[in-house]
């Protein structure tokens, strides 16, 4: 890393949690990510979900076709864990270059209706993953209607994650997009096979952002933004230098008319300015010197992959993202649309 008061050069980062959708929208969102990141973990929650090595390989080719010419970018593919994903698919997936499977509790978030209804139904597949070295990526929320929305992550740790870890002590688990002090503390105290990703929006905002001046649907995501005490705990974890925490945007594009709706979709689109938003969060915390580890070093180490060899440079320079991007036949409104950002990617 090299830095001055107004510029910062770091090893090219990776995004360890990304949604790019499919079809025509790929042509908008993939270039945004490829401009900043060397690699990205691609979420499998399409309709239908990506549940086979063959589907993952085909999806990867569609993503690569949307990467601008001359840009080096590698999508890292995942499978969607279901109650009946066969264990023998894991070996095929590993041989095809798939790196992980994603656990969505059924009903927890966008396109999660095919998700897991009972973790015990997946145990044979998880055993195969532990043996093959595939990672388990976890959306860590319970979905019981009697559990308060803001408590679902903390309850998941006690009811699901602790027993899961006890059964599979050497399965590498990424607790994705953590949002609470309880999650940060759990990961900090867990063994070397547990890590977590943190989004830029959960570092920058608490739940007040959803309600400032009225309902602001573009700040609505799952897991939902939490109290300020939780945001502060996430900032402390991200800027601590611990290799258990690394960058995962959870950038989740939706057509604007489905966000700005009576029952709007969950998800914040941040890929257009992701590394700039992380720089802002780390700068706010007085920890720009910790950004490279979080963005470029800890993730590859946990996944057992080499670091990227290139660099990116950020400059302290105010700029304003556009109000929207084309998204197939719809419009995509990014987080911070029309609002000034203090850091800009320049190389």
Curated annotation (Swiss-Prot):
Pfam families from the entry?
Answer: Amidohydro_1
Q: Does the keyword Hydrolase apply?
A: yes
Q: Which cofactor does it need?
A: Zn(2+)
Q: Which GO terms describe its biological process?
A: 'de novo' pyrimidine nucleobase biosynthetic process; 'de novo' UMP biosynthetic process
Keyword Endoplasmic reticulum found: no
Q: Which residue positions are annotated as catalytic? A: 250
Pathway the protein takes part in: Pyrimidine metabolism; UMP biosynthesis via de novo pathway; (S)-dihydroorotate from bicarbonate: step 3/3
Residues binding substrate are 19-21, 45, 139, 222, 254, 266
Co-factor binding comment: Binds 2 Zn(2+) ions per subunit.
Catalyzed reaction equations:
(S)-dihydroorotate + H2O = N-carbamoyl-L-aspartate + H(+)
Q: Which PROSITE patterns match?
A: DIHYDROOROTASE_1, DIHYDROOROTASE_2
Chain residues that bind Zn(2+) 1: 17, 19, 102, 250
Q: Which UniProt keywords apply?
A: Hydrolase, Metal-binding, Pyrimidine biosynthesis, Zinc
Write out the GO cellular component annotations. cytosol
Q: Known InterPro entries for this protein? A: Amidohydro-rel (IPR006680), DHOdimr (IPR004721), Dihydroorotase_CS (IPR002195), Metal_Hydrolase (IPR032466)
Annotated EC: 3.5.2.3
Output the Gene3D superfamilies linked to this UniProt entry: Metal-dependent hydrolases (3.20.20.140)
User: Which positions carry N6-carboxylysine?
Assistant: 102
GO terms assigned for molecular function = dihydroorotase activity; zinc ion binding
Q: Where does Zn(2+) 2 bind?
A: 102, 139, 177
Q: Which family does it belong to?
A: Belongs to the metallo-dependent hydrolases superfamily. DHOase family. Class II DHOase subfamily.
Q: What is this protein's function?
A: Catalyzes the reversible cyclization of carbamoyl aspartate to dihydroorotate.
Quaternary structure and interacting proteins, as annotated: Homodimer.
This chain's protein is named Dihydroorotase
This protein's species is: Acidovorax sp. (strain JS42)
């Amino acid at each position: 890393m090299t830095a001055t008061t107004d510029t910062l050069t770091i090893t090219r980062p990776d995004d360890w949690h990304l949604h790019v959708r499919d079809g025509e929208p790929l042509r908008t969102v993939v270039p945004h990510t490829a401009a900043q990141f060397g690699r990205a973990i691609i979420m499998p929650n399409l309709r239908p979900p990506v549940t086979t090595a063959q589907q993952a390989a085909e999806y990867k080719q569609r993503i690569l076709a949307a990467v601008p010419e001359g840009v080096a970018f590698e999508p890292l593919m995942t499978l969607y864990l279901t109650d009946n994903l066969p264990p023998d698919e894991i070996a095929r997936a590993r041989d095809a270059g798939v790196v992980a499977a994603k656990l969505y509790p059924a009903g927890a978030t966008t396109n999660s209706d095919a998700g897991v209804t009972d973790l015990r139904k997946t145990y044979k597949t998880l055993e195969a993953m532990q043996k093959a070295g595939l990672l388990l990526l976890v959306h860590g929320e319970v979905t019981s209607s009697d559990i308060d929305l803001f408590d679902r992550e903390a309850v998941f740790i006690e009811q699901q994650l602790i027993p899961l870890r006890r059964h599979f002590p050497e399965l590498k688990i990424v607790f994705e997009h953590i949002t609470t002090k309880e999650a940060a503390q759990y990961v900090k105290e867990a063994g070397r096979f547990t890590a977590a990703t943190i989004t830029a929006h959960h570092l920058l905002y608490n739940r007040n952002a959803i309600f400032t001046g009225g309902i602001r649907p573009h700040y609505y995501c799952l897991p939902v933004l939490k109290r300020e005490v939780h945001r502060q705990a996430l900032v402390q974890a991200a800027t601590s230098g611990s290799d258990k925490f690394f960058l995962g945007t959870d950038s989740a594009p939706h057509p604007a008319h489905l966000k700005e709706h009576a029952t709007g979709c969950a998800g914040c689109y941040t890929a257009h300015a992701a590394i700039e938003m992380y720089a802002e969060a780390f700068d706010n915390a007085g920890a720009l010197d910790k950004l490279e580890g979080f963005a470029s070093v800890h993730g590859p180490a946990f996944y057992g992959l080499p670091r990227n060899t290139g660099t990116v440079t950020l400059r302290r320079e105010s700029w304003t993202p556009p109000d929207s991007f084309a998204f197939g036949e719809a419009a995509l409104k990014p987080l911070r649309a029309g609002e000034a950002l203090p850091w800009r990617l320049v190389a």
